[in-house]
Amino acid sequence: MGVQSNISDTLSGKTILIVGGTSGIGLAAATQAKSFGAKVIVVGSDAGRAKEAAEQHGLSGWRAADVTKRTAIESALADIDHVDHLVLLAGSFVVGKVLEADVDHLRRAFEERVWAAIYTLRSLGDRLAADGSVTFISGALSDRPNAYGTAVLAAASAAMEALARGLALELAPRRVNTLSPGPIDTPLLGKALGDNRDAFVEGLRATLPLHRLGSAEEAGAAVLFLMANGWMNGATLNLDGGSRLV
């Protein structure tokens, strides 16, 4: 049986909830899952963008919520009867040095990644299928921090991976895994770097073994692999084109 056939057999007819699914990796995973016959609901912070993403790509539904607010998540998910697979990747690019940046700004790294995940899981409760899965999206900063104001973001990314491992035990027999992507060319990169994006990407490419950034579609395919592989549990999958080696 081929890989695509296995994914199709596993995901067809399933309900997939993607928190942070209106662009980039989340939207790529959503559209690919839909192509395999899944019913996909995306959650975003902006109602207009969430609605547009769902309608443009023929997804089953959308919700808008501030993921850092427990009551907002509860309200957004209240009418969803059942979820087979949950993907958690909401989070802005929170940058700022510990001794210089506003503390409330830095706190968002954990609120958007760790606490948002906890609020979502508690809101769903037993509506998350017993034979389902949860997939976190962290990032290479979790084990490759730098000196450019990413210490708190790196800590939040590492916390997501640790949380996922613990949840693989707490939520069993549900499977819980993390995808840890390296440099991926997504809208978030442009938002974070602004006018410096092109120069940064060009310099980064020269340092990478494959001389390019990964695509949202490649990362989305890895998300589907983690959903569909029934023996993958408590794992962190590094998808970085070898960038951790240099």
Protein language model regions, located:
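Conserved glycine-rich cofactor-binding loop
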Residues: 22-23
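C-terminal substrate-recognition "lid" of short-chain dehydrogenase/reductases
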Residues: 212-239, 244
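A glycine/serine/threonine-rich, flexible loop-to-helix segment
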Residues: 184-207
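Rossmann-fold cofactor-recognition segment
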Residues: 56-71
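Substrate-binding pocket helix/loop in short-chain dehydrogenase/reductase
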Residues: 97-98, 105-107, 200, 204
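Catalytic loop of short-chain dehydrogenase/reductase
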Residues: 109-110, 118-119, 131-172, 183
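Conserved NAD(P)H cofactor-binding loop of Rossmann-fold oxidoreductase domains
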Residues: 87-96, 241-242
